[in-house]
Design a protein with these regions (language model features):
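Short helix- or helix-capping micro-motifs
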Residues: 40-41, 131-139, 143, 184, ...
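Transmembrane-helix motifs of polytopic, lipid-linked glycan transferases
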Residues: 102-123, 160, 164
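Transmembrane-helix signature of polytopic, membrane-embedded enzymes
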Residues: 115-137, 155-156
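Short acidic/glycine- and proline-prone juxtamembrane loop motifs at membrane-interface regions
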Residues: 143-154
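Transmembrane-lumen/periplasm boundary regions of multi-pass, lipid-linked membrane glycan transferases
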Residues: 198-303, 315, 320
């Protein structure tokens, strides 16, 4: 084969690689990572919008919005950060499914951006791209992130807190120390599970060769004081409300036999390993020709990477140990926001370059997989139209519209308040009048009966046919509240002319006092 024919054979490959090479060059110029994240957000919002045409928002997302309707420093179930963010988002965007899909993906993109802020301290453009691409092969930044809740809100906070702590440890500057305290406090206000990240900071610092220099400085103590001060309003709320920081978690996950707790802890660790498997296997394939060099690099990690690895190990090892001690259960999902540490260290540990050809191929494969997910999104929508979600998500909007019609057949006044389980909470989102949602276990209810002032303004309760406790509760209310009207109606989703599985909804309405 002549030289000219060889070049002709290679040319088509060069052409398909050219856009990816331009992108990789753009990372060093500052636009490559933001551009990739913008494409990521756009594609995944489109995927979620199509895939969930036959399903409404996840209850966790609706709960975040519902809690945010009242500004407070906490709630009976969660610390307040996710509800604050949902409230702020709802002031800028309409209350629609697509806007909260956008919130979820923007939050996820900020998490990836925060990881890149750490990575750029150790590696250049191609490896920063490699890290981003490997993180996208975790089931974290799309599937875990798509329900905006107390877990997802930590995706940007954990890497940001880690960056601030890393800079504080390295420089011992008061600015970074204060930032580490503030962002760590924000992470705890996102979910109390973030206390394990703070423990990781402390243990990693204690195990590091430069621990004496760090702890002899003001940095760790400034971080601790600033973080504690940032949590004072929330602590005051807990003291005055009577809600303990772990009441809900222990009620929902505690009280199991020690064997069950140990099994849960083991499954947690196995789940973490399984979640990390794919990106680490991909990386292993890429570095395999130089595995001896890579092994040597791992044995001589940079001090900063050693600190990050120590933090990651602590956040994986300590939670299952606490689970066994408290005799509770745990799920690997709770660790998702910290798994970036292992992928980051694995990529940044290598001192040799990774083939740009390999990075181009991984970028092309990642883009192709995302486009394939978009192409298959209608299949998921069709499947869910025939096989409803277990949370009842197929019926939220339909039930809200039908109850609204039934309500206004009885009263011209807007529905003021709705109570019940998940369906009732979703009604407060999907009803165009957005009635307030009050859970039946709210302290203002007496023996499950809403206060008289609530009933006089107009109140309703709704339950799906399989919510046995809810159905029993509304029957009890109907027997003691004068003027209560019981209703039963059927709702059936439709997707592209295909009828879905119908569901029965039971409702109780109390029109406002004249």
């Amino acid at each position: 084969m002549t030289t000219s024919s060889t070049m002709a054979a290679v040319a088509p490959v060069s052409r398909w690689r050219r856009p990816f090479d331009v992108w990789l060059d753009g990372i060093a110029r500052g636009w490559g990572i933001p551009a990739a994240l913008a494409v990521f957000v756009a594609l995944w919002v489109a995927i979620l919008h199509v895939a969930y045409l036959s399903g409404d928002l996840h209850p966790d997302t609706i709960e975040a919005w519902s809690l945010g309707r009242t500004l407070a420093w906490g709630s009976m179930k969660h610390p307040p950060l996710m509800s604050w963010i949902a409230r702020a988002w709802a002031t800028l965007f309409p209350l629609t499914d697509w806007s909260f899909h956008l919130l979820a993906m923007v939050n996820s993109a900020f998490g990836l951006w925060a990881v890149d802020l750490i990575a750029r301290r150790y590696v250049g453009g191609d490896k920063r791209a490699l890290l981003l691409l490997l993180l996208l092969w975790l089931p974290v930044y799309q599937f875990h992130a798509q329900r905006f809740n107390a877990n997802a809100v930590l995706l940007p906070l954990w890497p940001l807190a880690t960056l601030c702590f890393l800079r504080s440890f390295e420089t011992r500057q008061l600015g970074w120390a204060m930032a580490a305290g503030v962002v760590s406090a924000l992470a705890i206000l996102g979910k109390y599970y973030s206390a394990f990240l703070v423990v990781g900071f402390a243990v990693a610092a204690l195990c590091h060769p430069q621990r004496r220099v760090y702890f002899m400085s003001a940095a760790p103590w400034v971080s601790a004081i600033v973080g504690a001060l940032a949590l004072v309003p929330h602590a005051h709320w807990m003291l005055t409300s009577g809600v303990g920081p772990f009441d809900y978690a222990l009620a929902a996950h505690g009280g199991v036999p020690i064997a069950a707790a140990a099994t849960s802890a083991l499954l947690f660790l196995l789940g973490v390993v399984a979640t990390l498997a794919l990106p680490l296997v991909i990386l292993a394939v890429l570095i395999w020709p130089r595995w001896r060099d890579y092994a040597a690099d791992l044995r001589s990690l940079k001090p900063g990477l050693l600190l990050l690895l120590s933090i990651g190990i602590v956040t994986i090892v300590v939670p299952p140990l606490v689970t066994i001690v408290l005799r509770s259960t745990i799920t690997a999902t709770w660790a998702a926001q910290g798994l970036f540490l292992f992928v980051l260290v694995a990529v940044c540990a290598s001192t040799f370059s990774i083939s740009r050809n390999a990075v181009d191929w991984l970028a092309a494969l990642s883009l192709a997989a995302t486009v394939l997910a978009l192409a298959l999104a209608p299949v998921h929508a069709i499947y869910r139209n025939a096989t409803p979600f277990k949370e009842g998500r197929s019926y939220y909007d339909l039930a809200a519209q039908e109850l609204d019609r039934r309500w206004h057949a009885q009263s011209a006044a807007p529905l003021a308040t709705v109570s019940g389980d998940t369906l009732a909470m979703s009604l407060s989102f999907y009803d165009h009048e957005h009635p307030a949602f009050i859970a039946p276990n709210d302290g203002s209810f007496v023996s499950g009966v809403p206060p008289r002032a609530v009933l006089q303004k107009g109140w309703a309760a709704v339950c799906l046919h399989d919510e046995a406790d809810c159905l029993l509760w509304i029957r009890q209310i109907a027997s003691v509240v004068p003027g209560a009207q019981s209703l039963t109606f059927s709702v059936q989703p439709q997707l592209w002319g295909r009828p879905g599985r119908p569901a029965q909804v039971s409702a109780l309405i109390v029109p406002p006092a004249s």
